[in-house]
UniProtKB/Swiss-Prot annotation:
The gene is MT-CO2. Its cofactor is Cu cation. This is Cytochrome c oxidase subunit 2. Gene3D superfamilies: 1.10.287.90, Cupredoxins - blue copper proteins. Residues 46-59 are mitochondrial matrix. Component of the cytochrome c oxidase (complex IV, CIV), a multisubunit enzyme composed of 14 subunits. The complex is composed of a catalytic core of 3 subunits MT-CO1, MT-CO2 and MT-CO3, encoded in the mitochondrial DNA, and 11 supernumerary subunits COX4I, COX5A, COX5B, COX6A, COX6B, COX6C, COX7A, COX7B, COX7C, COX8 and NDUFA4, which are encoded in the nuclear genome. It comes from Macrotus californicus (Californian leaf-nosed bat). Residues 1-14, 88-227 are mitochondrial intermembrane.
Length: 227
């Protein structure tokens, strides 16, 4: 989860988020090299007295500054496309959960279980217990088994919402009348926090998401207790 004065990403807990972190580092390296080159050229122009007033054209230079940016864009686009296709892949999900956005709470339905559904509201600040996080705790957490592929079907009952959990690399729009889907796979147990990431009204800031990822045997006990 995030912590005060954090400058980087949250720790990755899914294969997709790990790939996104690698892609971020790859792109940042390219941006750093380009910025260094531009700063060097600017400083050289400001500090040297040499000029080329007689130069009418420079085919070699024009060729280089056309081909080099194209190569750089390709080195950025190829890994990006790979991750986009990975995010769209859904291979034999262990279960399906339907998520509906409302003003201003989330509702969840475990479609593989009979009558296993609930609403998830933010816990008011006045009701928080010691150690709980303000504006991030909910009355009903989404409990999921660890190391199992989960398909999330996401939509909305009223206005645009967005279901986002940064540490899992997830952000999917909840659109009224449209059903979006994404996959979720956590490689370690724990609590993972997210929030609605699409402005949806006056209480947009009070739509937290809490995923509780547990071993399979604990998930089975929880699902039995909820039925």
């Amino acid at each position: 989860m995030a912590y005060p004065f954090q400058l980087g990403f949250q720790d990755a807990t899914s294969p997709i988020m790990e790939e996104l972190l690698h892609f971020h580092d790859h792109t940042l390296m390219i941006v750093f090299l380009i910025s260094s080159l531009v700063l060097y050229v600017i400083s050289a122009m400001l500090t040297t007295n040499l000029t080329h007033t007689s130069t009418m054209d420079a085919q070699e230079v024009e060729t280089i500054w056309t081909i080099l940016p194209a190569i750089i864009l390709i080195t950025i686009a190829l890994p990006s496309l790979r991750i986009l296709y990975m995010m769209d892949e859904i291979n034999n999900p262990a279960m399906t959960i339907k998520t509906m956005g409302h003003q201003w709470y989330w509702s969840y339905e475990y479609t593989d279980y009979h009558d296993l559904s609930f609403d998830s509201y933010m816990v008011p600040t006045s009701d928080l217990k010691p150690g709980e996080l303000r504006l991030l705790e909910v009355d009903n957490r989404v409990v999921l088994p660890v190391e199992m592929t989960i398909r999330m079907l996401i939509s909305s009952e009223d206005v645009l919402h967005s279901w986002a959990v940064p540490s899992l690399g997830l952000k999917t729009d909840a659109i009224p009348g449209r059903l979006n889907q994404t996959t979720l796979l956590s490689i370690r147990p724990g609590l993972y926090y997210g929030q609605c990431s699409e402005i949806c009204g006056s209480n947009h800031s009070f739509m937290p998401i809490v995923l509780e990822v547990v071993p399979l045997e604990y998930f089975e006990k929880w699902s039995v207790s909820m039925l």
